[in-house]
C-alpha cells in the first residue's frame, strides 16, 4: 500500500488512456450505465457507438452481471427511467396550461408600461396561447412513439452487443460475494462500498469488479478498461483543484488512482469514430493486471 498521491500529469495520463484504448492487448468492458446511456442518444450517435464497438474487435466485452442488471429494467418495463427528462416536457406543458389563463386575465396596460408589450396586451396574450400550443405539440410528438422507439433501441442493443457478453459462471462469484462485500464495505474498501445501504443489488459493483478480474486472470489479460458513468465516491472523488488526483488504497495488492478531467469521446474514448462528441464524456476505469491488481479511474 502507498500513501495517497495528490497530483499527476493530466496530459500524460490522458495519453496513457488513449494508448490503452488503441492497444490490441487491452480488453474493454462497459458498465450497465453505458447501456442505459444508449437510450439517451439519438440514432446517429448510437450508430457511432456501435461502429466503435466493431472497431474494437474481440477486445470489447460486457460482464454477465451488467446484463442481469439491464434485464431487470426490461422485465419490469422500467426503461423509461433512463429518460426521466422526457416526462418533464408533459409536466411543463400542463403547468404552463394551468397558469396561462390566470396570466392572461391578470395582465393589463398598467402592468406592461415600459416593457416590450406596452400597448400590446393582446399580442402578449396571443404569444402565451402560441407557447401553450407549441408545448402541447412537442409533448404529443415526443410521447406518441416513445414506447416503440425504446423497443427499437433494445432490439439494436441485442443485435449489436449480444455476442459481446462474457460466458462467466456468475454464480461462482455471487455465492460468497455478499459476505466478502460486507467485510470490505464495513472498512470502506472500494469499489462499491457506498452501495452498502441499498435494499437491492448492493453488491452489484463488486460483482462486476470480480467478474472482470476473473476474466483477466483466466485469459491472461494484463491490461483492461472499464467504461462507466458511476460517479459515487467509492469509485471516484472530486478534489477542489481540477488537477488534483490521488490514490485510493484498497489493500496490499489493490490501488485505486483517481483523475478528474473532462474527456471527450471523439478524441479519447472513440478515437476511430468521427462526429462522436454527442456520446458525451464518460468515466473511464483502467485496470492493469500484472503481479498485483491496480485499478485506475478517470472521470469527467
Task: Please place each PLM-identified region on the residue numbering.
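Active-site-proximal, substrate-binding regions of enzyme catalytic domains
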Residues: 2-224, 232-300
Amino acid at each position: 500500500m502507498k500513501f495517497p498521491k495528490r497530483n499527476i500529469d493530466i496530459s500524460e495520463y490522458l495519453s496513457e488512456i488513449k494508448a490503452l484504448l488503441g492497444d490490441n492487448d487491452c480488453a474493454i468492458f462497459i458498465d450497465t450505465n453505458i447501456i442505459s446511456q444508449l437510450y439517451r442518444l439519438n440514432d446517429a450517435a448510437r450508430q457511432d457507438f456501435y461502429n466503435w464497438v466493431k472497431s474494437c474487435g474481440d477486445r470489447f466485452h460486457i460482464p454477465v452481471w451488467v446484463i442481469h442488471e439491464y434485464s431487470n429494467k426490461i422485465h419490469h418495463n422500467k426503461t423509461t427511467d433512463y429518460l426521466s427528462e422526457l416526462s418533464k416536457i408533459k409536466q411543463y406543458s400542463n403547468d404552463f396550461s394551468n397558469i396561462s389563463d390566470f396570466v392572461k386575465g391578470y395582465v393589463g396596460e398598467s402592468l406592461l408600461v415600459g416593457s416590450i408589450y406596452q400597448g400590446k396586451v393582446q399580442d402578449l396574450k396571443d404569444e402565451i396561447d402560441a407557447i401553450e400550443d407549441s408545448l402541447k405539440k412537442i409533448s404529443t410528438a415526443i410521447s406518441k412513439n416513445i414506447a416503440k422507439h425504446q423497443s427499437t433501441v433494445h432490439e439494436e442493443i441485442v443485435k449489436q452487443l449480444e455476442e459481446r457478453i462474457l460466458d462467466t459462471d456468475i454464480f461462482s462469484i455471487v455465492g460468497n460475494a455478499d459476505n466478502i462485500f460486507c467485510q470490505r464495505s464495513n472498512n470502506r474498501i472500494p469499489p462499491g462500498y457506498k452501495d452498502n445501504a441499498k435494499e437491492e443489488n448492493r453488491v452489484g459493483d463488486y460483482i462486476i469488479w470480480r467478474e472482470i478480474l476473473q476474466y483477466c486472470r483466466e485469459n491472461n489479460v494484463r491490461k483492461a478498461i472499464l467504461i462507466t458513468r458511476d460517479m459515487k465516491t467509492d469509485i471516484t472523488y472530486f478534489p477542489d483543484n481540477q488537477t488534483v488526483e490521488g490514490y485510493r488504497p484498497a489493500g496490499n495488492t489493490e490501488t485505486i488512482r483517481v483523475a478528474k478531467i473532462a474527456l471527450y469521446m471523439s478524441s479519447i474514448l472513440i478515437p476511430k469514430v468521427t462526429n462522436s462528441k454527442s456520446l458525451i464524456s464518460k468515466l473511464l476505469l483502467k485496470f492493469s493486471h500484472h503481479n498485483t491488481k491496480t485499478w485506475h479511474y478517470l472521470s469527467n
